[in-house]
Amino acid sequence: MPIVPLRGIELYYESHGHRGDPTVLVHGSLTDSSGWARVLPGLARGVSVLTYDRRGYGRSTPGPRPTPVRTDAEDLAALLEATDFYPVHLVGHSYGAAVALRLASERPDLVRSLALHEPPYVGLLADRPATAEFGRTFLAAIDPIAAQVAAGAAAAAARTVVDAFSVRPGAWDRLPEAARRTGAAAMDRWVEEYRDGEALRPDPAGLRETLVPVLLTVGEESPAFLREISALLAADLPNATLRSIPGTGHTPQLSAPDPYVGLLLSFLLERNVPQS
């Protein structure tokens, strides 16, 4: 199984499919690259896919802590260069979307396009009068969740987080047992990620300068705050399209893999470079 040593850590990655443009899937919080399993077969029929575990997740080593979003973006750049797998289409889910957008802003030479599902830029809400109260309330909830994790109640903290990102009650309980174990084990990383101000507030200049095509997707059943964040991004990014996915919420790769794959491939294949 491929492991690449870089920047003092080891990143685990897998390759799927051998046709079409290089495409990298960047997972979010409380999961790892295995969370893409339901969309991989469909995507690999149209594009060449690389999945990987971000540092501190799955089979990748953690390195020094904490890990800000810029470190995740630098890791991804190093992985692309080490595997000679670029320029790429980046598909990012949740926090992974923030990593992907950060890389596109800092290393546009590596990125061909972005497909981002509900990046959790809660700081955007806190910075705008109409949504400031919700944004501040969300940010204020991070410390109590961190206290739960520090007290050894990671599973309870993970339940709070997962349920907050769903409009239907019991989202945590509907997850497979393996996914709940993975989520609880990753709660310390979640705390780091959501305490990183750069991760929750994209640089306005960086948004204006991100010129690659961007597909922003939201779930019709996602909480209003996540849909609002993506709408704000769509207005700020110069070359963005916003699409809604019916019958799903924050995790379309789990709950609506076929519609999600169809939307992604429609976007990606329009931008494929013909093979010589």
Where are the regions that the model predicts?
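The conserved beta1-alpha1 loop
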Residues: 24-28, 93, 218
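Active-site loop/turn elements of alpha/beta-hydrolase fold enzymes
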Residues: 54, 119, 247
